[in-house]
Amino acid sequence: MGKDAICMEEFLQDKERFADLFNGSLFLGKRVILPEELLSASEKYAEQREKESPLQKKKRERDVKMYLSCGTQLRILAVEAQKYVDYSMPVRCMNYDAQEYMKQLRELQQKNSRLILEKKVMPTTAERLCRVMKTDRLHPVYTMCLYYGREPWDGPRDLWHMMSFEAAGRGREDSLLFRDYPMWLVCANEQTDLSHYHTDIREVFQILNCRGNKQGILNLLQDKAYGNLTEETWETIATLTDWPELLKKKKRYQKTEEEGEGYDMDSAWKEILADERARGREEGREEGKTSIIQNMINRNFSDKDIRAAVECRQKTIDEVREKNACKMVE
């Protein structure tokens, strides 16, 4: 698992953010899902491979999974975070959900087997055979695919768009019989109104939408929220946008206790840009110096005169002369 995936999963394990992601993406910011009603439940599922023994199983792991408990009702919410477009994603999500339902079903069957064995229930023949009581119910599973990559999502958004109905020559008939399985897709780079989010998910999504646009980032960082980020949000932004300088110099931009103890990304970004400009000017000066040395060599100036005119060391002149000789050989 890459550092980006680990970073995003850790970021979303926070119940406030997890609830905000669902509320902001699906309910226009309305607090339908409450953090205090969530219980972390991320886990792996054992899936038997075909043509292999029962002991040979493949582990499928949920990225982030939470139980939502509201009164006597239990729901299962899960997020699959994607940095790259996955053209198999609708099937993957359907499989994760199926594994979750199978897990619940096995637990019900085990419970009912004990009750039947202890003669605490009187099942019908059908109930005994399947070990599921007519009144048994499963908990609904809701899986969201969160795409936070740079490129537009050009993959399928439901099972329908992975099908080849025309291949059999009966496209219309096949499509009428087919039962779709929609995928719950949220693309960070398609978010235009982020006011529905009320945690630092908003700041992360905004920065992700400005990747590659320095002026856009500068304008965005005028928002005072970026002047007082939490350490985890700082690290998430630095990792997902591939800014190693922000991770290296993190402590440098931490505010004092009186200032709020947050991290000031606005100041950090401005300093990084200033450093880049300084490096660019220095590289420009070096390129200009190299060009002058080459011209003086071509005009047969002595090394002593070149050193005096350009204020460089003999080693620099030798390197320029050697580089020019290599070009002539090529």
Pin down the residues of each PLM region.
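Elongated, amphipathic alpha-helical interaction scaffolds
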Residues: M1-E330
